[in-house]
């Protein structure tokens, strides 16, 4: 019964606040994005032509929603360039519901050095 499924992933859960300090953020991060919303989210990223547009599209909903490590890896595969994959992996780490499984994102990378760069940035 989702009448607006085409853009529901981009909604900010009814909150009008767009400031960086969202008190509801911590509670929203305990549950990952639903698989239906995730499909819409991946489709929206894939529709973008340019890498920077893909990255900003990927980052936008994560201001109020979270992903699993496996979902983050899927998003990383949507990018053409390794640098973008690294940037997204670093950005998404704080929005991961299962950070203990973050190693799963490393399969989406081409180079061993990329893993080191991410681990250094996220403090592992």
Model regions and ranges:
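General marker for long, soluble alpha-helical cores
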Residues: 1-124
